[in-house]
Amino acid sequence: ECETYEGLFNFYQDRRDGKSYLEIDTSHLNKEYIYFSYYENGVLEAGSVKGRFRGSKVIKITKFFNNIDITVENTKYFFDNESPLSNAAKTNINTPIIISEKIIAKNLNKTRFLINADNIFLNESFQQIKSSYKPGYKGFKMGNLSKSKTRYHEIRNYPENTDVIVNYTYENKYPSNRGGGAITDSRIISVLVQHSLIRMPKNNYKPRFDDTRIGYFTTQTNDMTTIDRVNYRDFINRWHLVKKDSSKDLSEPVQPIIWWIENTTPYELRNIIKDGVESWNIAFEAIGFKNAIVAKQMPDDATWNPADIRYNTIRWFIQPGSGYAVGPSRANPYNGELYDADIRIAADFVTSFYKEFDEYVVPVTEDEITQLWHNHDEQNHDAHGACNYSDHLKREMAYGWNQLLINGGLKGTEEDLKRYVHQGLVDLVLHEVGHTLGLRHNFKASSIYSVEQLSNKNFTERYGISGSVMDYHPVCLLDGGNTLFQTKPGPYDMWAIQYGYEQFNDDNLLENLENIASQSNHPLLVYGTDEDSFGTSSRGIDPLCNTWDMSSNPIEFYKDELNSVNYLWDNLLDKFEVPGGTYQKIRSVFSQGIGEYMYAGRSATKFIGGINFSRNHVGDFSQQSPFTVIEAKKQREALDFILVNYFDKDAFDFNPELLNKLAPERNEDFRDYVWNLDRPDYPIHSVVKRMQMYPLYSLYHPRRLARVKDNEIKNNTTDVFRMEELFTKVNDVIWQELELKENINSYKRELQIMHISMLSNILYNTDSMPADAVAFARSSLSEILKNIYLSMANNNVDYYTKSHQEYCSKLIETILDPKIQIN
C-alpha cells in the first residue's frame, strides 16, 4: 500500500493518506551520520532565503527498548586521547536526544524497524525553522506551524544520502506587520526546507589546520587538553585530494574533483562553464596536481539525479528576475573534509543581460536618513558564508556593456557580445567554484594593481585585473575594453590553494604550512574577507578591503568611474534614442549610472577615519603593524572627492531633455510594475537626495567619528586628519552659497535640510557620540545660523532661497534652544 523509496534509509509513503515511515535497520544502529539542511525556497522577510544553509551536525542512531533515538553529537570540542582529561570528555557537554520514536513495526528477525517519519520531518525536530524574535521586535513574524498544511514536497533516496524536502506552512491569523510584495498573503507563509541524512565519509583523509592569514571556510573545534594560549583547533574545509604517485613532481590525483554540468544548461554556454571550472587547474598544477579538477557534461539520458551526493553538479535553473548564483559545499563536521558541492546558476544571470534591465534606484523616504543613522548595527555584508556576487555582477555587466557601446570600446557586434558574456560567465564560475574548494571572499585582492597598470592592456592580458577571483569585481573599463573580467586564478588564489592542497610529508607538514602562511604580507597576497569589509558599513575600517572597487588607489578609480558615468549620461540619447528603441531602455541605462554614483560615494567614506588592517603574525615576511592609520592626505582626497561630486553646488546638473525621456515600461508584468510604480516620471530630486544621503550619514556615523577621534592620537606623523577638519570642510561646502551670496539650487536645499537633521541627531545622541562630535555639531549649527542671518540681509537671491533660509533658521533655533523645542 506504500510507495517505496530505497536508499541510505528506506522511506515508505502510504498512497492513500500520505502518512510516511522511515526504516531503521541494525546496520544503522550505533553509527554516526551527517545531518544537513538548507532552504530550498522561502521568503526573505521570514529569514528563509533560497540556498541558505540551516546547519550541519553529526547524529547518532540508537535503539532504546522499543524506541529509536537520534542524538546530536557535540563536535565543537577535541580531547587528546593521550591526556587524562579525555576521561572527562563527556562532562558538562550536552549530547541531547532530539528524536525518540516508538517502533511501530519490525520484521521477524528483528533487524528492520519502522518508525513514524511524519513525527520527525513534518515538525521542527531536526532543526528550528521559524526564527526566534527578540522582545519588542516589530518586523514581519511567522505564525505557528500548521500541521494540516505542512506536507512532503519531494522524497529522494540514494545510496549515500536520503533527502526529504518539506513544505512548512506557518499561520498567523492577525499579523501586525504584513511584509512586502513577495508575501502573497501575510497570514500564511510557506517555507521549503531540505533535510539530508548522509553517510559519514570513511577514508584516510588528513585534516589541515586553519590559519587566519589565508581565507578558508572552517570547521571549528576547541582543543580542551592543550595548554597553549589559544586552544582553537579549527580545520579548513577542503577536498580529499591525493597524488597517485607522490614521487612525481606532476601527478594526477587518485580521485579528481569532478564537476558535472547539468543537462539543463544551454548548449552555447556549456563550454564557457567548462572553461571556468577547469581554469582552476592552473593553481593545482603549480603544486603538482595534473587534472585535479575535471568538468564533464551530464548526458541528456542520464539515469542519475544531481541531488545524489556522489555527483558534484553545476545546475542551471529558472528563477525569474534574479541573477542568483551560489556555490555551497558540505563538509564533515569532525574534520572539514568536503564531500559534496553543487553550484546553482539562475538562467536570468545571462538572459537578463540581453534584456532591458530594471531600474534599481528607488525614491528616498523623508525619515530614512534618521533611520539609517540610528541603525548603528548596519546590515552585515554577506555574513556567514553567503554570496551575492552574481546578482550584482549582472548589473555591472549591463552597465559595462552600455558604457563600452557609448565610449566606442566595443562596437556591439555579435562577436563582441559573445566575448563579453564568455568573460563574465567565466569570472562568475571561477568565483563560485572557488567557494566549493573551501575559499572565502577576498575583498582586498582588487587593490594590488595601480590604475596605471590596469590601464595597460598588455599588463591586464598577462596578469588579469585582480589578485583573486574571490573578490567582487566591477567590469574593468580602464584598458579600453580589452580585459574586462578576472578570468583566471590570481596570485592570492595560487597561494591559498598551495596552503590548502599541496601534499607534504607528515613530519614537516606544520613547518611547511607556516612557511606558506608567513608570506601573507607580500603585496600580491593581501587578504581581507566579509568580517573585515562589512560592505560599505561603518563597521569596515579598511578602505582597501571593499566590494566593487578596483586598484591600489580606489579614489582615483572612483573619479574615473564618475567621469565615465557623466560621459554616458551626456551621450545617452545619441546612442539609444534610435528608431525601434524604447525610452525604457534609456531610463534603465540612466539608472545604471545612478547606481555606480551611489556606490562610489558611500565606499569613498571608508577612507575617513580609515585604518589599513593586516592579518599578519609576529615575525612574518616584511613585518608590519596590524593597524596603520590611513595617511591624512588620502583621507582629505577622499573627503574632497565626496564634497566635489556629491555636496558641491555644481555636483548635479542634468539635461532637461534627457530627464523628459526617462519613461518607464508601460507593459504589465507579473510583478505589477506598472501599478506599483509610485511616479511614472523620473523622481530626480528624490534620487539625488539618496545619492547625497548615503555619504552624508556615513561620514557622521558614530563609529566613524569615534575612529577619527582615536586616530588623532594613533598617528605617528605631524600631519593628522582631525575631526575639526571633517566638520569644517563639510559645513563650508554644503553651505557655500551663504558665503558666495548666491541662490541655493533645489538639490542643495534638500541637502542642507538633511545636514541640519544630521547635526541635530549628533547633538541629542550624546550617549553614542564622542563628546567632541557633540561640541562640533553645536558650534556648526551656531555658525550656520549666524551665516544664514547675514545672508538673509541679501536681497539679491530668489524667493526659493529666501524661504529656505527662513525655514532653516527657525529649524536651527528650535534645535539650539531647548525652551523653543519644548514649546
Residue ranges and their predicted role:
Residues 278-289, 319, 434-435, 439, ...:
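Sec-exported extracytoplasmic/periplasmic mature domains
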Residues 297-317, 422-479:
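The catalytic-center signature of Zn2+-dependent metalloproteases
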Residues 77-79, 83-106, 110-127, 409, ...:
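An exposure/low-complexity boundary signal
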